[in-house]
């Protein structure tokens, strides 16, 4: 082990480095990632240049906590209900019930909502601001343009939707990104048209949150048949009829239609020309049941025309059906992809009266229980990360799909050599390799959860990273990071760690990173450089000097220490993590502390030295 030093000359305040320079923008399409299966998300070299006119929508649910907990309950305002003292059993997690008693799961009461699994963010309710913020961030990072709020059950959940829009507005005022908003209605139900009218009367006609409305063909888009509109609404909205299964009569010839889910190979909806695809759905799965009038049991492992019916055969975490549906969408190449969905998470328990033939892998007899839309890890269609099971696989598969569909801007290639003075922050002013992170994503959580869960608290947000920079002087990589407020003490646990992936190294790694800085923790003048011995097993190989000044931090890592063999041409991915990741669980970057960039993503620095033309 060796000690690597740099000399500290002087300290300069933050004002000197920012001195009028435009703030860097958060640009997720330039980030890279590696998921738990080793699948990579790359850059424009993998996906090609941007394809203008491609739009992504995501089916989005806001019913969590609005229909009671241990028992079904409906209130006139359809707001989230505060759990009562008698809510001692829910959430009913079907996957856990099956794991405990596969042949006789102990379901909750008839009519009660049951979860198919546990969200990574916990069993939440829909008005938890911390969750709303996390969802907006994850969806924006993925490239989702619009969430399509489910109002197909004749309920608009007005207090919850209003809370969501208020949070989105607040996030935007803070400089952060959110998707736009649209809604989907089932106007063929008895009160379906009235549901649409309520949303129009309460939000659209009043011009509320207009900056959040998603527009298509110049007008706010809602998913419902045009004939459901009054003349006033018809002049106001663009509409697309939206329901399940393009083989059903509602779809007609497909004009101005868009299924929220469909069987492979999916059909597309069109607007003026039947030969021009406008919209198409893509889903990880459809339903857990076969009905007397249709075969619809399609789980996450369905592919090549077959649903595996034993757990040994099922590959729920690989996204086989999801990939098949997306491949079909890329063949057709519509202007709008409708992904179903993000966060349904639960379904009501019903008793079979003879209409259902199978539930999941088993026969469903008269008098047996069944669940319409979701059941367990295999028979569910949410993309939001799961706790346990397949984790965040579907989220990063979504990110990959959207980049394939939209293309991405070319990532910048750097050629400048910079002489960095670690004591003079003004030397960073000319550095062009600048990477931004969301401001305010250390927001603390303190909100009641679902049913018996109690208060969900997360106060791990600490150092809010807002900007990173990287430079090299021909022998050393220099890393700079800036936080929103003064950086906390180095004695804090899991403090300001930097992870480095030298592309092409071939060395053992943790989540693709061969090296870590600050793992173990630093003292006030030195920090450890460690290398992975395979996974979260680190060996210290050197000490590095580093410097913290108020809300800025600089650390230097020599090429030789991390195996950069060609100083004129190399690529490095890197990631800052503060107060997250215990025992190697990188998914904690979705929920704890702060990571720059978010989740599993990492920044990429490409260096290609230009030839000296003076010689």
Feature map (PLM): residue ranges:
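N-terminal secretory signal peptides that target proteins for export/translocation
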Residues: 1-6
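Bacterial N-terminal signal peptides
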Residues: 9-20
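Glycan-processing catalytic domains of CAZymes
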Residues: 25-418, 424, 432, 487, ...
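Acidic/polar low-complexity flexible segments
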Residues: 412-429, 499-522, 561-615
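Acidic, glycine-anchored loop motifs typical of Ca2+
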Residues: 418-452, 506
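Short, well-ordered beta-strand segments enriched in hydrophobic/aromatic residues
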Residues: 423, 475-485, 552-559
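Beta-strand-rich interaction surfaces with strong enrichment in secreted/lumenal proteins
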Residues: 466-469, 541-546
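Short coil-to-beta strand junction motifs in C2/discoidin
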Residues: 490-497
């Amino acid at each position: 082990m060796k000690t690597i030093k740099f000399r500290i000359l002087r300290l300069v305040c933050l004002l000197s480095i920012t001195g009028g320079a435009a703030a860097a923008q958060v640009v997720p399409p330039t980030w890279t990632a590696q998921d738990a299966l080793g699948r990579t998300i790359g850059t424009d070299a993998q996906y090609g240049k941007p394809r203008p006119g491609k739009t992504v929508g995501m089916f989005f649910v806001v019913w969590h906590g609005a229909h009671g907990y241990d028992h079904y309950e409906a209130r006139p305002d359809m707001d989230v209900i505060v759990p009562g003292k008698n809510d001692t059993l829910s959430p009913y997690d079907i996957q856990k019930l099956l794991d405990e008693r596969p042949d006789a799961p102990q379901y909750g009461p008839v009519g009660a909502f049951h979860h198919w699994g546990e969200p990574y963010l916990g069993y939440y309710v829909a008005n938890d601001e911390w969750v709303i913020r996390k969802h907006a961030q994850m969806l924006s990072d993925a490239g989702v343009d619009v969430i399509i709020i489910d109002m197909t059950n004749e309920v608009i959940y007005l207090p919850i939707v209003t809370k969501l829009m208020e949070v989105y507005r607040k996030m935007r005022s803070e400089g952060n990104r959110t998707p736009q908003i649209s809604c989907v209605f089932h106007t063929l139900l008895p009160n379906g048209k009235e549901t649409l009218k309520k949303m129009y009367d309460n939000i659209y006609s009043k011009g509320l949150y207009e900056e959040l409305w998603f527009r298509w063909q110049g007008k706010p888009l809602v998913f419902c048949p045009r004939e459901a509109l009054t003349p006033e609404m018809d002049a106001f909205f663009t509409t697309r009829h939206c329901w399940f299964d393009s083989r059903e009569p509602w779809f007609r010839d497909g004009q101005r239609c868009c299924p929220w889910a469909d069987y492979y190979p999916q059909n597309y909806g069109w607007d003026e020309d039947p030969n021009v695809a406008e919209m198409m759905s893509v889903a990880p799965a459809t339903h857990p049941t076969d009905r007397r009038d249709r075969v619809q049991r399609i789980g996450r492992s369905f592919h090549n025309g077959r649903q595996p019916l034993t757990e040994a055969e099922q590959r729920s975490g690989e996204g086989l059906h999801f990939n098949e549906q997306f491949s079909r969408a890329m063949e057709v190449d519509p202007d709008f992809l409708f992904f179903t969905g993000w966060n349904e998470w639960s379904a009501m328990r019903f008793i079979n009266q003879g209409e259902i033939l199978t539930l999941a892998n088993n026969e469903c007899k008269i008098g047996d229980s069944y669940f319409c839309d979701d059941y367990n890890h295999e028979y569910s269609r949410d993309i939001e990360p799961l706790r346990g099971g397949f984790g965040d696989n579907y989220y990063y598969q979504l990110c990959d799909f959207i980049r394939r569909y939209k293309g991405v801007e070319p990532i910048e290639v750097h050629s400048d050599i910079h002489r960095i003075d670690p004591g003079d922050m003004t030397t960073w002013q000319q550095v062009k390799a600048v990477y931004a992170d969301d401001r305010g994503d250390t927001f603390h959580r303190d909100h009641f959860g679902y049913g018996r869960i109690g208060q969900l608290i997360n106060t791990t947000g600490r150092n809010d990273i807002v900007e990173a920079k990287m430079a090299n002087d021909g022998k050393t990589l220099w890393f700079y990071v800036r936080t929103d407020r003064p950086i906390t003490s180095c004695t804090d646990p899991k403090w300001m760690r930097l992870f480095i992936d030298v592309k092409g190294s071939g060395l053992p790694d943790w989540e693709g990173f061969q090296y870590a800085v600050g793992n173990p923790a630093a003292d006030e003048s030195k920090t450890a450089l460690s290398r992975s011995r395979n996974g979260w097993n680190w060996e210290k190989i050197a000490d590095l000097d580093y410097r913290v000044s108020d809300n800025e931090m600089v650390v230097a890592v020599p090429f030789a220490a991390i195996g950069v063999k060609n100083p004129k041409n190399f690529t490095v991915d890197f990631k800052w993590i503060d107060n997250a990741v215990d025992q190697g669980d990188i998914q904690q970057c979705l929920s704890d502390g702060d990571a720059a960039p978010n989740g599993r993503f990492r920044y990429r620095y490409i260096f290609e030295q230009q030839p000296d033309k003076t010689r």
